[in-house]
Protein backbone atom coordinates (compact mmCIF):
# COMPACT_ATOMS: atom_id res chain seq x y z
CA UNK A 1 0.00 0.00 0.00
CA UNK A 2 1.23 3.46 -0.94
CA UNK A 3 2.80 5.98 1.41
CA UNK A 4 2.90 8.52 -1.41
CA UNK A 5 2.08 12.15 -0.69
CA UNK A 6 -0.18 12.21 -3.75
CA UNK A 7 -3.96 11.85 -3.38
CA UNK A 8 -5.89 11.72 -6.64
CA UNK A 9 -9.41 13.16 -6.46
CA UNK A 10 -12.02 10.91 -8.08
CA UNK A 11 -14.35 13.74 -9.07
CA UNK A 12 -16.80 11.63 -11.04
CA UNK A 13 -20.60 11.27 -10.84
CA UNK A 14 -20.61 7.47 -10.85
CA UNK A 15 -18.51 4.41 -10.14
CA UNK A 16 -17.66 3.38 -13.71
CA UNK A 17 -15.11 6.06 -14.60
CA UNK A 18 -13.79 6.19 -11.03
CA UNK A 19 -12.99 2.48 -10.98
CA UNK A 20 -11.64 2.66 -14.52
CA UNK A 21 -9.18 5.34 -13.43
CA UNK A 22 -8.25 3.36 -10.32
CA UNK A 23 -7.42 0.42 -12.57
CA UNK A 24 -5.16 2.64 -14.71
CA UNK A 25 -3.26 4.04 -11.71
CA UNK A 26 -1.42 2.17 -8.95
CA UNK A 27 -2.12 1.88 -5.21
CA UNK A 28 1.65 1.79 -4.76
CA UNK A 29 1.92 5.33 -6.13
CA UNK A 30 -1.07 7.29 -4.84
CA UNK A 31 -4.09 7.37 -2.56
CA UNK A 32 -7.57 8.21 -3.87
CA UNK A 33 -10.14 10.74 -2.69
CA UNK A 34 -13.89 10.10 -2.80
CA UNK A 35 -16.03 13.21 -2.42
CA UNK A 36 -19.70 13.95 -1.92
CA UNK A 37 -20.93 13.53 -5.49
CA UNK A 38 -19.44 10.09 -5.98
CA UNK A 39 -20.20 8.84 -2.48
CA UNK A 40 -23.85 9.93 -2.59
CA UNK A 41 -24.26 8.22 -5.95
CA UNK A 42 -22.48 4.97 -5.11
CA UNK A 43 -22.27 4.63 -1.32
CA UNK A 44 -19.87 2.62 0.85
CA UNK A 45 -19.52 -0.15 -1.72
CA UNK A 46 -17.46 2.21 -3.88
CA UNK A 47 -14.98 2.78 -1.05
CA UNK A 48 -14.87 -0.97 -0.47
CA UNK A 49 -14.11 -1.59 -4.14
CA UNK A 50 -11.17 0.82 -3.98
CA UNK A 51 -9.87 -0.61 -0.72
CA UNK A 52 -10.02 -4.12 -2.20
CA UNK A 53 -7.86 -2.83 -5.05
CA UNK A 54 -5.27 -1.88 -2.44
CA UNK A 55 -5.85 1.87 -2.28
CA UNK A 56 -5.85 4.14 0.74
CA UNK A 57 -9.09 6.13 0.48
CA UNK A 58 -9.63 9.67 1.72
CA UNK A 59 -13.39 9.95 2.30
CA UNK A 60 -13.91 13.67 1.77
CA UNK A 61 -17.42 14.33 3.12
CA UNK A 62 -16.63 17.39 5.28
CA UNK A 63 -19.05 16.65 8.12
CA UNK A 64 -20.46 19.76 9.81
CA UNK A 65 -23.35 19.25 12.25
CA UNK A 66 -24.02 18.93 15.96
CA UNK A 67 -21.37 16.87 17.79
CA UNK A 68 -23.48 13.74 18.29
CA UNK A 69 -24.49 13.59 14.63
CA UNK A 70 -20.92 14.07 13.42
CA UNK A 71 -19.67 11.41 15.83
CA UNK A 72 -22.13 8.90 14.38
CA UNK A 73 -21.23 9.88 10.83
CA UNK A 74 -17.54 9.37 11.58
CA UNK A 75 -18.19 5.89 12.97
CA UNK A 76 -20.02 5.02 9.76
CA UNK A 77 -17.22 6.51 7.67
CA UNK A 78 -14.65 4.40 9.53
CA UNK A 79 -16.70 1.29 8.81
CA UNK A 80 -16.17 1.81 5.07
CA UNK A 81 -12.46 1.10 5.47
CA UNK A 82 -11.47 4.69 4.72
CA UNK A 83 -7.90 5.70 5.56
CA UNK A 84 -8.76 9.36 6.16
CA UNK A 85 -12.00 11.24 6.88
CA UNK A 86 -12.70 14.91 7.46
CA UNK A 87 -14.93 17.43 9.18
CA UNK A 88 -15.32 21.21 8.91
CA UNK A 89 -13.26 23.05 11.52
CA UNK A 90 -15.99 25.70 11.53
CA UNK A 91 -18.13 23.14 13.37
CA UNK A 92 -16.14 24.02 16.48
CA UNK A 93 -13.92 22.33 19.03
CA UNK A 94 -16.67 20.24 20.65
CA UNK A 95 -17.73 18.80 17.31
CA UNK A 96 -14.16 17.96 16.30
CA UNK A 97 -13.43 16.37 19.68
CA UNK A 98 -16.58 14.25 19.36
CA UNK A 99 -15.43 13.10 15.92
CA UNK A 100 -11.99 12.20 17.24
CA UNK A 101 -13.47 10.28 20.19
CA UNK A 102 -15.85 8.35 17.92
CA UNK A 103 -13.03 7.34 15.59
CA UNK A 104 -10.96 6.25 18.57
CA UNK A 105 -13.62 3.64 19.31
CA UNK A 106 -13.01 1.94 15.95
CA UNK A 107 -10.56 -0.90 15.48
CA UNK A 108 -8.37 0.64 12.78
CA UNK A 109 -8.84 4.36 13.31
CA UNK A 110 -8.80 6.50 10.17
CA UNK A 111 -6.89 9.75 10.20
CA UNK A 112 -9.10 12.73 11.00
CA UNK A 113 -8.53 16.03 9.24
CA UNK A 114 -10.43 19.29 9.51
CA UNK A 115 -11.20 21.60 6.60
CA UNK A 116 -10.14 25.17 7.37
CA UNK A 117 -10.93 27.59 4.53
CA UNK A 118 -11.95 26.18 1.15
CA UNK A 119 -9.42 26.78 -1.61
CA UNK A 120 -12.19 28.37 -3.69
CA UNK A 121 -12.54 31.10 -1.04
CA UNK A 122 -10.69 34.37 -1.38
CA UNK A 123 -10.42 37.13 1.22
CA UNK A 124 -13.42 38.75 -0.46
CA UNK A 125 -15.44 35.55 -0.03
CA UNK A 126 -14.62 35.45 3.67
CA UNK A 127 -15.82 39.04 4.06
CA UNK A 128 -18.99 38.17 2.14
CA UNK A 129 -19.89 35.37 4.58
CA UNK A 130 -18.93 37.36 7.66
CA UNK A 131 -15.65 35.69 8.62
CA UNK A 132 -12.72 37.75 9.82
CA UNK A 133 -9.90 37.51 7.31
CA UNK A 134 -7.51 37.46 5.69
CA UNK A 135 -7.65 33.80 4.67
CA UNK A 136 -4.27 32.89 6.12
CA UNK A 137 -5.22 34.24 9.55
CA UNK A 138 -8.54 32.36 9.46
CA UNK A 139 -6.75 29.15 8.48
CA UNK A 140 -4.31 29.45 11.38
CA UNK A 141 -7.09 30.11 13.90
CA UNK A 142 -9.01 27.06 12.73
CA UNK A 143 -5.90 24.87 12.58
CA UNK A 144 -5.02 25.67 16.19
CA UNK A 145 -8.62 24.95 17.20
CA UNK A 146 -8.44 21.58 15.41
CA UNK A 147 -5.13 20.66 16.99
CA UNK A 148 -6.54 21.42 20.43
CA UNK A 149 -9.48 19.10 19.70
CA UNK A 150 -7.16 16.18 18.94
CA UNK A 151 -7.49 16.22 15.16
CA UNK A 152 -4.59 14.74 13.15
CA UNK A 153 -4.27 17.64 10.74
CA UNK A 154 -6.05 20.07 8.48
CA UNK A 155 -7.09 20.51 4.90
CA UNK A 156 -5.79 23.89 3.81
CA UNK A 157 -4.42 25.71 0.81
CA UNK A 158 -0.77 24.98 0.13
CA UNK A 159 -0.24 28.72 0.50
CA UNK A 160 -1.02 28.42 4.21
CA UNK A 161 0.76 25.12 4.89
CA UNK A 162 3.95 26.76 6.15
CA UNK A 163 2.00 28.93 8.59
CA UNK A 164 0.12 25.89 9.88
CA UNK A 165 3.36 23.97 10.35
CA UNK A 166 4.82 26.90 12.27
CA UNK A 167 1.76 27.15 14.54
CA UNK A 168 0.95 23.46 14.96
CA UNK A 169 4.20 21.55 14.47
CA UNK A 170 5.68 19.15 11.93
CA UNK A 171 3.58 16.19 13.08
CA UNK A 172 0.30 17.96 12.31
CA UNK A 173 -0.83 16.96 8.80
CA UNK A 174 -1.29 19.58 6.08
CA UNK A 175 -3.46 18.11 3.31
CA UNK A 176 -3.49 20.56 0.42
CA UNK A 177 -5.99 20.68 -2.44
CA UNK A 178 -5.68 23.29 -5.16
CA UNK A 179 -2.51 21.69 -6.52
CA UNK A 180 -1.91 22.69 -10.12
CA UNK A 181 1.32 21.91 -11.95
CA UNK A 182 2.48 24.57 -14.41
CA UNK A 183 1.25 22.43 -17.30
CA UNK A 184 -2.37 22.32 -16.03
CA UNK A 185 -5.17 24.90 -16.03
CA UNK A 186 -5.96 26.69 -12.77
CA UNK A 187 -9.68 25.79 -12.86
CA UNK A 188 -12.04 27.11 -10.15
CA UNK A 189 -9.50 27.19 -7.33
CA UNK A 190 -8.55 30.65 -6.05
CA UNK A 191 -5.45 29.77 -4.01
CA UNK A 192 -3.27 27.28 -5.87
CA UNK A 193 0.39 26.22 -6.00
CA UNK A 194 2.50 23.78 -7.98
CA UNK A 195 3.30 20.40 -6.38
CA UNK A 196 6.94 21.31 -5.80
CA UNK A 197 6.08 24.68 -4.27
CA UNK A 198 3.43 23.08 -2.05
CA UNK A 199 5.89 20.55 -0.62
CA UNK A 200 8.55 23.22 -0.20
CA UNK A 201 5.96 25.26 1.67
CA UNK A 202 5.13 22.52 4.14
CA UNK A 203 2.38 20.36 2.62
CA UNK A 204 2.40 16.73 3.79
CA UNK A 205 -0.20 15.45 1.29
CA UNK A 206 -1.19 16.85 -2.11
CA UNK A 207 -4.70 16.47 -3.55
CA UNK A 208 -4.64 16.53 -7.34
CA UNK A 209 -7.69 16.11 -9.55
CA UNK A 210 -8.08 17.24 -13.13
CA UNK A 211 -4.38 17.26 -14.10
CA UNK A 212 -4.53 13.47 -13.69
CA UNK A 213 -8.20 12.54 -14.09
CA UNK A 214 -8.61 14.46 -17.36
CA UNK A 215 -5.27 13.48 -18.81
CA UNK A 216 -5.23 11.27 -21.90
CA UNK A 217 -2.67 9.12 -20.08
CA UNK A 218 -3.39 9.37 -16.32
CA UNK A 219 -0.45 7.20 -15.29
CA UNK A 220 1.91 9.36 -17.36
CA UNK A 221 0.48 12.48 -15.70
CA UNK A 222 1.01 10.87 -12.29
CA UNK A 223 4.60 10.05 -13.25
CA UNK A 224 5.12 13.67 -14.26
CA UNK A 225 3.94 14.80 -10.82
CA UNK A 226 6.26 12.27 -9.18
CA UNK A 227 9.21 13.63 -11.13
CA UNK A 228 8.39 17.18 -10.00
CA UNK A 229 8.33 16.05 -6.37
CA UNK A 230 11.54 14.04 -6.75
CA UNK A 231 13.30 17.08 -8.20
CA UNK A 232 12.07 19.19 -5.29
CA UNK A 233 13.31 16.59 -2.78
CA UNK A 234 16.77 16.83 -4.31
CA UNK A 235 17.02 20.61 -3.86
UniProtKB/Swiss-Prot annotation:
Lineage, top-rank taxon, reads: Bacteria
Q: Please name the top-level EC class of this enzyme.
A: lyase
| Positions annotated to bind substrate | 11, 33, 60-69, 119, 180, 189, 209-210
Named from the GO MF annotations, one term is: orotidine-5'-phosphate decarboxylase activity
Q: Name one GO biological process term.
A: 'de novo' UMP biosynthetic process
Q: HAMAP family, alphabetically? A: OMPdecase_type1_B (MF_01200_B)
**Annotated function:** Catalyzes the decarboxylation of orotidine 5'-monophosphate (OMP) to uridine 5'-monophosphate (UMP).
| Protein name stated in the entry | Orotidine 5'-phosphate decarboxylase
What is the species of this protein?
Answer: Alkalilimnicola ehrlichii (strain ATCC BAA-1101 / DSM 17681 / MLHE-1)
Amino acid sequence: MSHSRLIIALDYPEAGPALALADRLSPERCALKVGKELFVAEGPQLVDALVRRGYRVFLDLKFHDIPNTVAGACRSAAATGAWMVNVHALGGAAMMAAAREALGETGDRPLLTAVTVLTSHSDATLREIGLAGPADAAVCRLAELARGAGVDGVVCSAREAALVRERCGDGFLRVTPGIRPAWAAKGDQARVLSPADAVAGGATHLVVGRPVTRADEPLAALARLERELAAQDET
